[in-house]
Amino acid sequence: ISRNKEELMKIDEGDKIDYLSIRFSHPRWMIENWIKQYGYEFVEGLCMENNNRPKLNIRVNTLKITREELSKRLSSYGYMIRKTSYAKDGIIIDNPVRITNIDEFKLGFFIIQDESSMLASQILNPRENSLVLDLCSAPGGKATHLAQIMGNKGRIISRDIYDHKLNLIKQNANRLGIDIIKVQKFDAMKLDENLIEQVDYCMVDAPCSGLGIIRRRPEIKWNRNKEDMKQLDNIQRRILNNAKKYIKPGGIMV
């Protein structure tokens, strides 16, 4: 085997779907679907990126500290950092060893959160003293970011269906010093008649395939199938159809 190693490792490039599936260790059905939507070159780059080790992103809690000041503190501890490309309050840490053990984390100066998640709240951009509804809210990264954008002024209703997830929202809000979030146990697939046309802004992080975080959880590739995608599509439609009814005329949903 060792003598024929190079020959054994060759992958037939004749079938482009098989080639990407084998080379980058992704299910064939997934590659096939992606190529139909995005084209071969994009999918090749996506698969390559999925196999890279992700960097840790944190969101600065600007209610307590500026990004510049926190950056200085982290650098003084030996952390290699840089600003996120698009999120205004994000920092990328290349060597996040024991990052949750430092005082700045315990004091609520930052929360671990992907840049893509930060951008959702940044786009919604709720005003102070607004009423915001955050559906499928746990663990509260977006809810606490929305509160931060609002200057901790107004009201945010954060809903999820599990008690332990609601507790995560409370814990994160408490550590960050945020007190405008009210957690509620509620199934987003059910319509709440009492909230129709009541909220100024609505954030919907509907249950999804998780394929966008393959770098962080590579096992997701093998825990999903085509049937899962169809079921999730139905769930998402029901939640979104309910959510749009809660927004006041002129309100915004992301």
Where are these regions (language model features)?
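S-adenosylmethionine
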Residues: I1-V254
